Protein backbone atom coordinates (compact mmCIF):
# COMPACT_ATOMS: atom_id res chain seq x y z
CA UNK A 1 0.00 0.00 0.00
CA UNK A 2 1.27 3.47 -0.86
CA UNK A 3 0.34 6.40 1.37
CA UNK A 4 1.04 10.10 0.98
CA UNK A 5 0.26 12.80 3.51
CA UNK A 6 -1.41 16.04 2.52
CA UNK A 7 0.27 18.61 4.74
CA UNK A 8 -0.59 22.24 5.40
CA UNK A 9 0.44 24.74 2.72
CA UNK A 10 0.54 28.50 2.95
CA UNK A 11 -2.60 30.11 1.45
CA UNK A 12 -2.40 32.06 -1.83
CA UNK A 13 -0.85 35.50 -1.69
CA UNK A 14 -3.18 38.50 -1.58
CA UNK A 15 -4.82 39.00 -4.94
CA UNK A 16 -4.31 35.41 -6.07
CA UNK A 17 -7.21 33.32 -7.31
CA UNK A 18 -8.56 31.51 -4.23
CA UNK A 19 -9.89 28.71 -6.43
CA UNK A 20 -6.45 28.06 -7.83
CA UNK A 21 -3.80 25.91 -6.19
CA UNK A 22 -1.87 27.67 -3.41
CA UNK A 23 0.93 29.80 -4.81
CA UNK A 24 3.27 28.46 -2.13
CA UNK A 25 2.75 24.71 -2.27
CA UNK A 26 4.09 22.41 0.42
CA UNK A 27 7.19 20.83 -1.13
CA UNK A 28 6.33 17.42 0.34
CA UNK A 29 2.87 17.19 -1.19
CA UNK A 30 2.62 19.49 -4.17
CA UNK A 31 0.26 18.56 -7.00
CA UNK A 32 3.28 17.39 -8.99
CA UNK A 33 4.55 15.25 -6.09
CA UNK A 34 1.14 13.63 -5.63
CA UNK A 35 0.91 12.90 -9.33
CA UNK A 36 4.37 11.33 -9.29
CA UNK A 37 3.53 9.17 -6.27
CA UNK A 38 0.28 8.03 -7.86
CA UNK A 39 2.10 7.06 -11.06
CA UNK A 40 4.69 5.05 -9.13
CA UNK A 41 1.95 3.24 -7.18
CA UNK A 42 0.13 2.44 -10.42
CA UNK A 43 3.32 1.08 -11.95
CA UNK A 44 3.90 -1.09 -8.87
CA UNK A 45 0.23 -2.14 -8.99
CA UNK A 46 -0.47 -1.22 -5.36
CA UNK A 47 -3.30 0.81 -3.80
CA UNK A 48 -2.54 4.49 -3.23
CA UNK A 49 -4.09 6.75 -0.59
CA UNK A 50 -3.71 10.44 0.23
CA UNK A 51 -4.40 11.23 3.89
CA UNK A 52 -5.24 14.80 4.83
CA UNK A 53 -3.43 15.92 7.99
CA UNK A 54 -3.38 19.64 7.17
CA UNK A 55 -4.98 20.78 10.43
CA UNK A 56 -2.93 18.70 12.90
CA UNK A 57 0.19 19.60 10.91
CA UNK A 58 -0.58 23.31 11.16
CA UNK A 59 -1.41 23.14 14.87
CA UNK A 60 1.48 20.88 15.86
CA UNK A 61 4.25 21.90 13.48
CA UNK A 62 3.59 25.30 11.90
CA UNK A 63 2.33 27.06 15.05
CA UNK A 64 5.30 25.62 16.95
CA UNK A 65 7.70 26.86 14.25
CA UNK A 66 6.24 30.36 14.48
CA UNK A 67 6.21 30.41 18.30
CA UNK A 68 9.83 29.25 18.54
CA UNK A 69 11.14 31.87 16.14
CA UNK A 70 9.22 34.61 17.87
CA UNK A 71 10.69 33.48 21.23
CA UNK A 72 14.23 33.75 19.88
CA UNK A 73 14.86 30.07 19.29
CA UNK A 74 15.78 28.34 16.02
CA UNK A 75 13.51 25.29 15.59
CA UNK A 76 13.90 22.21 13.43
CA UNK A 77 10.27 21.34 12.56
CA UNK A 78 11.27 18.02 10.97
CA UNK A 79 11.96 16.55 14.42
CA UNK A 80 8.46 17.21 15.68
CA UNK A 81 6.91 16.19 12.36
CA UNK A 82 8.67 12.82 12.36
CA UNK A 83 7.59 12.02 15.90
CA UNK A 84 4.01 13.32 15.91
CA UNK A 85 2.89 13.26 12.27
CA UNK A 86 4.83 10.68 10.24
CA UNK A 87 5.42 8.10 12.94
CA UNK A 88 2.22 8.69 14.91
CA UNK A 89 -0.66 9.78 12.64
CA UNK A 90 0.71 8.12 9.51
CA UNK A 91 1.67 4.98 11.42
CA UNK A 92 -1.82 4.77 12.94
CA UNK A 93 -3.42 5.05 9.49
CA UNK A 94 -1.03 2.47 8.03
CA UNK A 95 -1.81 -0.04 10.77
CA UNK A 96 -5.54 0.62 10.34
CA UNK A 97 -5.15 -0.33 6.67
CA UNK A 98 -3.64 -3.64 7.72
CA UNK A 99 0.02 -2.81 7.18
CA UNK A 100 2.68 -4.70 9.13
CA UNK A 101 5.34 -2.02 8.77
CA UNK A 102 5.79 1.59 7.74
CA UNK A 103 8.60 2.07 5.20
CA UNK A 104 9.86 5.57 4.40
CA UNK A 105 12.59 6.95 2.17
CA UNK A 106 14.81 8.22 4.98
CA UNK A 107 18.51 7.45 4.72
CA UNK A 108 19.02 5.65 8.02
CA UNK A 109 19.31 2.06 9.24
CA UNK A 110 17.41 0.11 11.87
CA UNK A 111 18.12 -3.35 13.27
CA UNK A 112 17.81 -5.43 16.44
CA UNK A 113 20.41 -5.42 19.20
CA UNK A 114 21.64 -9.05 19.38
CA UNK A 115 21.94 -8.86 23.18
CA UNK A 116 18.85 -6.93 24.32
CA UNK A 117 16.57 -7.46 21.32
CA UNK A 118 15.77 -3.74 21.31
CA UNK A 119 15.54 -1.86 18.04
CA UNK A 120 18.62 0.21 17.17
CA UNK A 121 18.58 3.34 15.03
CA UNK A 122 21.87 3.72 13.16
CA UNK A 123 23.50 6.12 10.73
CA UNK A 124 23.00 5.41 7.03
CA UNK A 125 25.75 3.76 5.02
CA UNK A 126 25.87 6.93 2.91
CA UNK A 127 27.00 9.38 5.59
CA UNK A 128 26.56 12.31 3.19
CA UNK A 129 22.80 11.57 3.06
CA UNK A 130 22.37 10.28 6.62
CA UNK A 131 19.10 11.49 8.22
CA UNK A 132 19.43 9.89 11.64
CA UNK A 133 19.67 13.37 13.21
CA UNK A 134 16.00 14.11 12.48
CA UNK A 135 14.82 10.64 13.56
CA UNK A 136 16.44 10.52 17.01
CA UNK A 137 13.01 11.32 18.49
CA UNK A 138 11.52 7.90 17.63
CA UNK A 139 10.52 5.50 20.40
CA UNK A 140 10.94 1.73 20.55
CA UNK A 141 7.27 1.35 19.62
CA UNK A 142 7.71 3.52 16.53
CA UNK A 143 10.99 1.84 15.57
CA UNK A 144 9.39 -1.60 15.90
CA UNK A 145 7.18 -0.78 12.89
CA UNK A 146 9.76 1.22 10.92
CA UNK A 147 11.58 0.07 7.80
CA UNK A 148 14.19 2.19 6.05
CA UNK A 149 15.13 0.32 2.86
CA UNK A 150 17.39 3.10 1.54
CA UNK A 151 19.70 3.06 4.55
CA UNK A 152 22.17 0.62 3.00
CA UNK A 153 22.48 2.48 -0.31
CA UNK A 154 23.93 5.68 -1.71
CA UNK A 155 21.75 8.20 -3.51
CA UNK A 156 23.25 7.33 -6.94
CA UNK A 157 22.56 3.63 -6.28
CA UNK A 158 18.93 4.41 -5.42
CA UNK A 159 18.51 6.49 -8.57
CA UNK A 160 20.06 3.69 -10.64
CA UNK A 161 17.66 1.10 -9.18
CA UNK A 162 14.70 3.40 -9.85
CA UNK A 163 15.86 3.91 -13.44
CA UNK A 164 16.29 0.16 -13.97
CA UNK A 165 12.67 -0.33 -12.90
CA UNK A 166 11.49 2.49 -15.14
CA UNK A 167 10.13 4.59 -12.28
CA UNK A 168 9.24 8.12 -13.43
CA UNK A 169 10.93 9.76 -10.41
CA UNK A 170 14.40 8.30 -11.00
CA UNK A 171 15.88 11.67 -11.93
CA UNK A 172 13.58 13.90 -9.90
CA UNK A 173 15.32 16.78 -8.12
CA UNK A 174 15.41 16.60 -4.34
CA UNK A 175 14.45 19.37 -1.92
CA UNK A 176 16.25 20.04 1.35
CA UNK A 177 14.20 23.06 2.41
CA UNK A 178 11.59 23.20 5.16
CA UNK A 179 8.60 21.84 3.28
CA UNK A 180 6.09 24.58 4.14
CA UNK A 181 8.48 27.55 3.81
CA UNK A 182 8.68 28.75 0.21
CA UNK A 183 12.20 29.43 -1.11
CA UNK A 184 13.54 28.81 2.42
CA UNK A 185 12.48 32.37 3.33
CA UNK A 186 11.60 31.67 6.95
CA UNK A 187 11.76 35.36 7.91
CA UNK A 188 9.15 36.24 5.30
CA UNK A 189 7.09 33.21 6.29
CA UNK A 190 7.00 34.21 9.98
CA UNK A 191 5.88 37.72 9.02
CA UNK A 192 3.18 36.49 6.62
CA UNK A 193 1.94 33.82 9.02
CA UNK A 194 1.53 36.37 11.80
CA UNK A 195 -0.40 38.70 9.51
CA UNK A 196 -2.65 35.97 8.10
CA UNK A 197 -3.63 34.55 11.48
CA UNK A 198 -3.78 37.77 13.48
CA UNK A 199 -0.84 36.73 15.63
CA UNK A 200 1.74 39.10 17.11
CA UNK A 201 4.43 39.92 14.58
CA UNK A 202 8.11 39.91 15.56
CA UNK A 203 8.75 43.20 17.36
CA UNK A 204 11.79 45.47 17.07
CA UNK A 205 14.07 45.71 20.09
CA UNK A 206 17.59 46.55 21.25
CA UNK A 207 20.91 45.08 20.14
CA UNK A 208 23.08 44.83 23.25
CA UNK A 209 26.72 43.97 23.87
CA UNK A 210 27.82 41.63 26.66
CA UNK A 211 27.89 44.49 29.16
CA UNK A 212 24.28 45.42 28.39
CA UNK A 213 25.15 48.55 26.43
CA UNK A 214 22.80 49.23 23.54
CA UNK A 215 24.58 49.32 20.18
CA UNK A 216 21.59 49.52 17.89
CA UNK A 217 18.12 48.15 17.18
CA UNK A 218 16.93 44.92 15.61
CA UNK A 219 13.88 44.31 13.43
CA UNK A 220 12.54 41.26 15.31
CA UNK A 221 14.19 38.20 16.85
CA UNK A 222 12.95 35.96 14.04
CA UNK A 223 15.22 37.83 11.62
CA UNK A 224 18.43 36.75 13.37
CA UNK A 225 20.23 33.56 14.26
CA UNK A 226 23.09 32.66 16.58
CA UNK A 227 26.44 33.12 14.83
CA UNK A 228 25.14 35.70 12.35
CA UNK A 229 27.58 38.53 11.53
CA UNK A 230 26.17 40.28 8.48
CA UNK A 231 23.10 42.47 8.46
CA UNK A 232 23.33 43.72 12.05
CA UNK A 233 23.51 47.36 10.98
CA UNK A 234 25.98 48.41 13.67
CA UNK A 235 29.54 49.71 13.45
CA UNK A 236 32.22 48.35 15.78
CA UNK A 237 35.99 48.10 16.06
CA UNK A 238 35.87 44.33 15.67
CA UNK A 239 33.43 42.01 13.88
CA UNK A 240 30.41 41.27 16.06
CA UNK A 241 28.31 38.13 15.94
CA UNK A 242 24.91 37.26 17.35
CA UNK A 243 25.59 35.39 20.60
CA UNK A 244 22.08 35.08 21.98
CA UNK A 245 18.48 35.88 21.18
CA UNK A 246 17.00 36.94 24.52
CA UNK A 247 13.26 36.39 24.27
CA UNK A 248 12.57 37.69 27.78
CA UNK A 249 14.07 41.09 26.93
CA UNK A 250 13.36 40.93 23.19
CA UNK A 251 17.05 41.67 22.74
CA UNK A 252 19.79 40.51 20.38
CA UNK A 253 23.05 40.01 22.28
CA UNK A 254 26.23 40.44 20.23
CA UNK A 255 29.93 39.98 20.87
CA UNK A 256 33.23 38.72 19.44
CA UNK A 257 33.50 35.41 17.60
CA UNK A 258 35.39 33.81 20.50
CA UNK A 259 32.29 34.21 22.69
CA UNK A 260 30.34 31.88 20.39
CA UNK A 261 32.32 28.86 21.54
CA UNK A 262 30.79 26.47 24.06
CA UNK A 263 32.00 23.17 25.41
CA UNK A 264 29.17 22.55 27.89
CA UNK A 265 25.43 22.96 27.46
CA UNK A 266 22.14 21.38 28.51
CA UNK A 267 19.21 20.03 26.54
CA UNK A 268 15.56 19.49 27.44
CA UNK A 269 12.71 17.38 26.03
CA UNK A 270 15.31 14.63 25.84
CA UNK A 271 14.34 11.36 24.17
CA UNK A 272 16.23 8.07 24.24
CA UNK A 273 15.79 5.55 21.43
CA UNK A 274 15.82 2.71 23.96
CA UNK A 275 13.09 4.60 25.87
CA UNK A 276 15.08 4.85 29.13
CA UNK A 277 18.08 7.10 29.82
CA UNK A 278 21.50 5.65 30.65
CA UNK A 279 22.26 5.06 34.33
CA UNK A 280 25.03 7.65 34.28
CA UNK A 281 27.46 9.58 32.07
CA UNK A 282 28.09 8.04 28.63
CA UNK A 283 30.86 8.65 26.11
CA UNK A 284 29.23 9.84 22.90
CA UNK A 285 29.64 11.81 19.72
CA UNK A 286 27.40 14.88 19.62
CA UNK A 287 25.88 16.62 16.59
CA UNK A 288 24.37 20.06 17.25
CA UNK A 289 23.05 20.69 13.72
CA UNK A 290 21.87 18.51 10.87
CA UNK A 291 25.02 19.01 8.77
CA UNK A 292 27.46 19.56 11.66
CA UNK A 293 30.46 17.32 12.23
CA UNK A 294 30.09 15.17 15.36
CA UNK A 295 32.26 16.07 18.36
CA UNK A 296 33.34 13.67 21.10
CA UNK A 297 32.09 14.29 24.60
CA UNK A 298 30.22 13.06 27.64
CA UNK A 299 26.45 13.17 28.09
CA UNK A 300 24.89 12.92 31.54
CA UNK A 301 21.13 12.40 32.05
CA UNK A 302 19.53 14.92 34.42
CA UNK A 303 16.11 15.02 36.12
CA UNK A 304 13.01 16.37 34.38
CA UNK A 305 13.88 15.04 30.94
CA UNK A 306 17.08 17.04 30.62
CA UNK A 307 20.70 16.12 29.93
CA UNK A 308 24.10 17.81 30.05
CA UNK A 309 26.66 17.55 27.26
CA UNK A 310 30.33 18.22 27.95
CA UNK A 311 32.44 18.30 24.79
CA UNK A 312 36.14 17.54 24.53
CA UNK A 313 36.60 20.72 22.53
CA UNK A 314 34.45 23.84 22.26
CA UNK A 315 32.37 24.41 19.16
CA UNK A 316 30.76 27.52 17.72
CA UNK A 317 27.13 28.55 17.44
CA UNK A 318 25.43 26.05 19.74
CA UNK A 319 21.93 27.27 18.95
CA UNK A 320 18.94 27.11 21.35
CA UNK A 321 16.00 25.32 19.74
CA UNK A 322 18.16 23.08 17.57
CA UNK A 323 18.71 19.46 18.59
CA UNK A 324 21.84 17.92 20.04
CA UNK A 325 21.89 14.25 19.03
CA UNK A 326 24.02 11.63 20.79
CA UNK A 327 25.71 8.74 18.97
CA UNK A 328 27.41 5.72 20.53
CA UNK A 329 27.15 1.95 20.67
CA UNK A 330 29.78 -0.61 19.77
CA UNK A 331 30.32 0.77 16.27
CA UNK A 332 29.75 4.40 17.23
CA UNK A 333 26.94 4.76 14.70
CA UNK A 334 23.94 4.08 16.93
CA UNK A 335 21.61 6.94 17.80
CA UNK A 336 21.27 6.91 21.58
CA UNK A 337 18.99 9.93 21.85
CA UNK A 338 18.98 13.69 21.88
CA UNK A 339 17.26 16.82 23.09
CA UNK A 340 16.62 20.48 22.32
CA UNK A 341 19.46 22.84 23.20
CA UNK A 342 18.63 25.28 25.99
Q: What annotation goes with each model-predicted range?
A:
Residues 1-136, 147, 157-158, 242:
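ATP-dependent adenylation/nucleotidyltransferase module used to activate substrates
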Residues 103-110, 114-342:
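AMP-forming adenylation/ATP pyrophosphatase catalytic core
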